[in-house]
Amino acid sequence: KRIELINTEKLLIDILISNSDRLRNVKLGEGELNFIINSKIPDLRIELTDFSTCFNLNSLVKPFRNIYVKNDLHGELFKTFLKVNEIDSNKHREFLDLLYDSLDSDSLPESFGAEDLFYVANDNLSLSPDQLYIHKSQIKNLSFLSDNELLQIYPNICALPNTDLFFNINGLNENNYLVLLSISPDLSINDIEKII
């Protein structure tokens, strides 16, 4: 049974590599993989998730020598993301500074941010990791946005293990178009509607 699973895993990897062009559309790729695999293992169901249609929180910093420093360009795009998600504009700068401080490697607080020593004085103790996020839920540790505001952005944020910010246009839909709108400021809602 174990050898069969290993062979199936190898088959899956080979299929993914040889069909990578056709699998750019996640749902299409998921269907094709399930069709191919179900002929060999009928009980196996494959689900693919495209993480290139969300705003990568880790893109708010960039590598510089051996540390991470804030990425001002992506910070401006994140403020646009907050704006199109109708988050109170008075919170944008402070929230962004808190994110920078939790992700960057230095010990210097941003204007509205806080590093570890500043968090200790807070009733809701929350030490910043000073490293890339492992999971998007770490944004909750900042205890800054209301639950409703967090729910507005949560489906469209992610924490990928890199500092890249990109969007897979093949995955564009009515649930994630605000991400594309925020990272491509030259596009209008009308442009995006035409693409969808």
Residue ranges and their predicted role:
Residues 1-196:
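Compositionally biased linear targeting/interaction segments
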